[in-house]
Amino acid sequence: MSIKQWPEGERPREKLLERGAAALSDAELLAILLRVGTRGMSAVDLARYLLQEFGSLGRLMSAEVGKLSAYKGMGTASFTQFAVVREIGRRILAEELQESIVLSDPDTVADYLRFHLGQEKVEVSVALLLNRQNQLIAVRELSRGTVAENTIYIREIVKLALDEYADSLIIAHNHPGGSPEPSQEDIMFTRRLAQAMSLVDVSLLDHFIVTAQTVRSFRQLGLMP
């Protein structure tokens, strides 16, 4: 049965208009994006199937175009739609973060980092640069791919903080393998970076490790120098 044949109150679009987006399931929200299903499957049926195949909404929305195109009814159009939704969400979170007092709202930082880094397939490091009021100045990508900790890399972070006139910063990186626990290398790098930042009167406030499901704070773990 196509969605047009459903009772009006159960159709995703009508349900959204009547009850709000929060009342819709993941499959119903996704069906609105997909707009149409495939032969023998409504848009909601296709959405449910894809969610089951990928395991979560986040994994589906972050799937590479080649993997997505392997499923009937999906292709570059769906990939670009998903990419746009992800980027809009990331920018909204960035705006909220920039308007907030970062240290009084750590959940906003964690939400932003999870959205920004949680689905990355390679290790990505970022710096959140803050002013004296602990407000966000900028978010800058530091590296993409595994980067060995070295003096030049630390110098680049110090230079970035000085160029942006930051009074403090938070760094974060993801663990694509899924474990949020800091490695010994992560701990040693954080100590060296904190020492380097102190020489230019910039404080390293925290270091976050991000996975798709979890965000770990070095400060909360008692690991900050």
From Swiss-Prot:
Per UniProt, the keywords (alphabetical) are: Hydrolase, Metal-binding, Metalloprotease, Protease, Zinc
Keyword NADP assigned:
no
Please tell me where Zn(2+) binds in this chain: H173, H175, D186
Residue numbers covered by motif JAMM motif? 173-186
GO BP, one example? proteolysis
Domain MPN residues, every copy: 102-224
InterPro entries per UniProt: MPN, RadC_JAB, RuvA_2-like, UPF0758, UPF0758_N
- Which PROSITE patterns did the record assign? MPN
Q: Which one of the record's GO molecular function terms can you name?
A: metal ion binding
Q: Which domain of life is it from?
A: Bacteria
The entry sums up its family as follows: Belongs to the UPF0758 family.
This protein is called what? UPF0758 protein NMCC_1157
